[in-house]
UniProtKB/Swiss-Prot annotation:
It comes from Bacillus cereus. InterPro entries: Enterotoxin_cmpnt, HBL. This is Hemolysin BL-binding component. Keywords: Cytolysis, Enterotoxin, Hemolysis, Host cell membrane, Host membrane, Membrane, Secreted, Signal, Toxin, Transmembrane, Transmembrane helix, Virulence. It holds the Pfam family Bacillus_HBL. Cytotoxic protein, part of the enterotoxin complex. Responsible for binding to erythrocytes. This enterotoxin is thought to be the cause of the diarrheal form of gastroenteritis caused by food-borne strains of B.cereus. Residues 1-31 form the signal peptide.
Length: 375
């Protein structure tokens, strides 16, 4: 029997996504009388390059969601005090509700969806731990020709893979629901924002010049956020000293983001009731709109990851079939074909674990703050 793991695995709810299949590792040949097996049928690890790219996308998505949600909460309440909206008596109420909806989505991200995303990273960490605990026993089983122990180990690992695939799909469904809900609200918010600007301009408010200034500041925020992401991309390259260059880029980006905060604070100050109202509504709309766009990329990435979990499940099923076939042979070395892939998988999961842990800590840094509900 295979040696059981000396610790209690996390609850099934933490065994989520983020692994892929189709690793490229050396093709091993069966010992005497054993037919040659295609290496793709016996892979036990993820495609490391694709996995790193997927982890990176997940981290950048979470960082963007944190930032835009934070700005939604920090943005002042919409206030129509002292402003008359003739002919559209329900518009103030609609826009107040738009802001409430946007903040509710930010809270959903922070209290529910972000936790599920963190659990996807926990899933890869825990899978590496499980694989590591099974490794020595499976190597011994290969060396002694113990097919039953090998099958039990692969079957146990496959069970965790299936759980990860299942919960990956649930996360995709949750993100899709959030995207659809936000998409509906963004369209309504955008329509109400445009109508408000038209009304304010007709009342003589100089919102055009201020709107241009607002867009410049928000554009700068997005630019430096992208620059910071580019620096992260460079650091992930990890070749020819590029991590140092990437670190400089990230440092510059963070400095500039810090300098932009006073500009955002300036835009939040009351100058003229009508202009200030336009600013507050514009900032709220801009952030919820950016969240809407970020969700599309996240769903695409997670769909890819879910598919790869499914493919990895198929790979392990194939490995079980090869073990069954090899077990019919009399040679004690009949399972040696698995050892190169077992060794490659051990190293690969360890590398991916490191990336997953790093991203987990980064994602947890920012908590969306509560806001006093509007009356």
């Amino acid at each position: 029997m295979i040696k059981k793991i000396p610790y209690k695995l996390l609850a099934v709810s933490t065994l989520l996504t983020i692994t892929t299949a189709n690793v490229v590792s050396p093709v091993a040949t069966f010992a005497s009388e054993i037919e040659q097996t295609n290496n793709g049928d016996t892979a036990l690890s993820a495609n490391e390059a694709k996995m790193k790219e997927t982890l990176q996308k997940a981290g950048l998505f979470a960082k963007s969601m944190n930032a835009y949600s934070y700005m939604l909460i920090k943005n002042p309440d919409v206030n129509f005090e002292g402003i008359t909206i003739n002919g559209y008596v329900d518009l103030p109420g609609r826009i107040v509700q738009d802001q409430k909806n946007a903040r509710a989505h930010a809270v959903t991200w922070d209290t529910k969806v972000k936790k599920q995303l963190l659990d996807t990273l926990t899933g890869i960490v825990e899978y590496d731990t499980t694989f590591d605990n099974y490794y020595e026993t499976m190597v011994e089983a290969i060396n002694t020709g113990d097919g039953e122990t090998l099958k039990e180990g692969i079957t146990d690992l496959r069970g965790e893979i299936q759980q990860n695939q299942k919960y990956a799909q649930q996360l995709i469904e949750e993100l899709t629901k959030l995207r659809d809900s936000i998409g509906h609200d963004v369209r309504a918010f955008g329509s109400n924002k445009e109508l408000l600007q038209s009304i304010l301009k007709n009342q003589g408010a100089d919102v055009d010049a201020d709107q241009k200034r607002l867009e410049e500041v928000l554009g700068s925020v997005n630019y430096y956020k992208q620059l910071e992401s580019d620096g992260f991309n460079v650091m992930k390259g990890a070749i020819l000293g590029l991590p140092i260059i990437g670190g400089i880029i990230v440092g510059v980006a963070r400095d500039n983001l810090g300098k932009l905060e006073p500009l955002l604070a300036e835009l939040r100050q009351t100058v003229d009731y009508k202009v200030t109202l336009n600013r507050v509504v514009g900032v709220a709309y801009s952030n919820i709109n950016e969240i809407d766009k970020a969700l599309d990329d996240a769903i695409n990435a997670l769909t890819y990851m879910s598919t790869q979990w499914h493919d990895l499940d198929s790979q392990y099923s194939g490995v079980l079939g090869h073990i069954e076939n090899a077990a019919q042979k009399a040679d004690q070395n009949k399972f040696k074909f698995l050892k190169p892939n077992l060794n490659a998988a051990k190293d690969s999961w360890k590398t991916l674990r490191t990336d997953a842990v790093t991203l987990k800590e980064g994602i947890k840094e920012l908590k969306v703050e509560t806001v006093t509900p509007q009356k």
